[in-house]
């Protein structure tokens, strides 16, 4: 299990996920918009 001395905790995970989403946000939004346009055109 995780000990109190462990430096990797839930807050680190949240910050890592937030940072990753912020880096990939534009690409993800473009993909979503493209997929939506393809669905709307079909």
Curated annotation (Swiss-Prot):
- Tissues in which the UniProt entry reports expression: Expressed by the venom gland.
* Keywords for this protein: Allergen, Cytolysis, Disulfide bond, Hemolysis, Hydrolase, Lipid degradation, Lipid metabolism, Secreted
Q: State where the protein is found.
A: Secreted
Explain the post-translational modification. Contains six disulfide bonds.
Superkingdom, natural source: Eukaryota
**Hydrolase as a keyword?**
yes
- Under the GO molecular function aspect, what terms does this record hold? phospholipase A1 activity
Q: Name one GO cellular component term.
A: extracellular region
Recorded E.C. number(s)? 3.1.1.32
Chemical reaction(s) catalysed: a 1,2-diacyl-sn-glycero-3-phosphocholine + H2O = a 2-acyl-sn-glycero-3-phosphocholine + a fatty acid + H(+)
Top-level enzyme category: hydrolase
Which GO terms fall under biological process for this protein? killing of cells of another organism; lipid catabolic process
Q: What is this protein's function?
A: Catalyzes the hydrolysis of phosphatidylcholine with phospholipase A1 activity. May act as an allergen and induce hemolytic activity.
| Protein family membership | Belongs to the AB hydrolase superfamily. Lipase family.
**Protein's name in the database:** Phospholipase A1
Q: From which organism does this entry originate?
A: Polistes gallicus (Paper wasp)
């Amino acid at each position: 299990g995780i000990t109190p001395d462990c430096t990797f905790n839930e807050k680190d995970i949240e910050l890592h996920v937030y940072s990753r989403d912020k880096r990939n946000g534009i690409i993800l939004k473009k993909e979503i918009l493209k997929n939506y346009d393809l669905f709307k055109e079909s």
